[in-house]
Amino acid sequence: MNTPVVDFVRRYAQQRTTRMHMPGHKGRGPLGCEELDITEIAGADELYEAEGIIAQSEANATQLFGTARTYYSTEGSSQCIRAMLHLALQMRPAKAGRPVLLAARNAHKALLYAAALLDFDTQWLWPAPDAAGALCTCPVEPEALSSALDELAAEGRTPFGVYLTSPDYLGFVQDIAGLSAVCHAHGLPLLVDNAHGAYLHFLKEGSRHPIQLGADLCCDSAHKTLPVLTGGAYLHLGSSVQADEAAVRNALALFGSTSPSYLILQSLDAANAVLADSFREKLDICRWRLGMLCRELDALRPGLALPLTGAHREPLKLTLDAAALGLSGQQLAQALRERGVECEYADPRYVVLMPSAESSAAEFACLQTALHAICGEAPAADVSVAADDPAAFAALAGALEAQPRRFTIREAVLAPQEMIPAAEAVGRICAAPAVSCPPAIPIVVSGETVPPEALPLFARYGIEKAAVVKE
C-alpha cells in the first residue's frame, strides 16, 4: 500500500529547500526528526480541508478498516470523541428539546468536557450491582439498554445517541452487536469509544471492530495498540451516518489545532503499509506468546491473570489481579518496575500490561522472568488485601441517581471553582470531574453533588483533592 504523506515529506527533506516557513527549527535540531516536521506547505495538503495526499492516505485507512469513511486525528481519541458527539447532535431532529446522551458511566473525562463544550446532558447507564466492582468497567446488557431507553421514552425524553466504552481499561468488551441492534430498533446511533481496540479489526478469526459490529460512529486511538506515534487516532463512520465530508472535517476542526503534527500524520500514513502487509501475522504471534504466558501464570497462581478469551474479553491486554499474590495493584506494579517492566496502569486491585504486535520475544521473556520471580517471592493470597467492593459502587450509583441535579455539566465546568480536600467535599457541587489518570474515569461528574458514598472511592483511587463550585 502506498504512503503518500511519508513519500512527500521525505522528498521535501531530500531537496534541501530553504525553509522560510514554520516551524522555527528549520529542519534541524537535537531530536533528529526535525527535517520531517513540516507544516501545510504547497503540496502537503491540509488536514481539515484534505484533497491531496492526506485524503489519499485516509482513503487507504478507510479501505483497511472497511468503514464508510475514516479520518485522521493528531490529537488523540479525545478530539474524535468531541467530533463524533458533535456529529450525533447535528443528526438529531430539530426542536427535540434539551439534548441528552445515554452513556455508560465508565466514560473517559473527554466525554464530560465534550458535554461542557456542546452543552448536552447525560443520563448514565450504571452496571448491575453485582458487576460494579471496578471503576473502569461498566457492563451493559442489551436488555438493560432497552429498558433504559423505554424509561426515557416514558418520560418524554429521547437521547440523541448511546455512548459506550469498549474495550475498557481492564479489557472488558461490550456486546456491540447486541447493543447496536437495540439502538437501531429505537432509531438511535451507537457511538463507541474504541480507543483501546484499533487492532480488533485485524484478528485472524475475523474483525471484532465496533464498526463491523454495527456501531455508527467510533474512535480508535491508533497509538495505543498500533505502530503509531502518540496522538495518532481515527474517527470512523459507519454506512448509516449521512454527514457530508465538510461536516465531518468541520467537526474535527472545531476541536483541533490549526497546526496538526505532520510527524503524527506520517506515522498514521506509514501504519497503513504495515497494516496491509505483515501486521496480522505479527499480531497473531503476539497473541500466541501472551496466551502461553497466561497459561503459565494460571499454573503458578490461579486467578492472577484475567482471561484473554471469551466474548467479553479483549485478546491483547494482560490484566493481573494482584490480590492473587497477596499484593495491591500498586505493589505488583512496583515489583515489576524493579525488574525492568513498566506497566500501563495500576490501581488498588489490578495491573494492566499492554503488549502489542511490536513486542519482541525478548520483551516477553523479560516479562515472563519478572512475573515468575514475583510469583515465587509473593506470599499466598492474603484475605486482608482489599478487594473491589461492588456494594461501594452500587451505593454511589444509588446516591447520585437519587439527588436532584443543580448544575448542568457545562455550568459546573465553567463556574468559578476551588480545590478543597476530598474529605471535605461532601455536599459540594463537583466542578472538574474527580478522576485519577490513568484511567481518567470520573468517580463524581461535573454538576453532581458529592455524596458521602464517594469518599471511600476517593480514598481507594488516591484522589486527595476535589474541584468544587465556589459558594
Summary of predicted features, one role per range:
Residues 72, 124-126, 220, 345, ...:
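Structural signal for conserved beta-strand scaffold positions within catalytic alpha/beta enzyme cores
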Residues 428, 467-470:
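Flexible, glycine-rich loop/tail regions that form catalytic "lids" or insertion modules at the edges
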Residues 2-10, 76-306, 322:
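Conserved PLP-enzyme active-site core in the AAT-like
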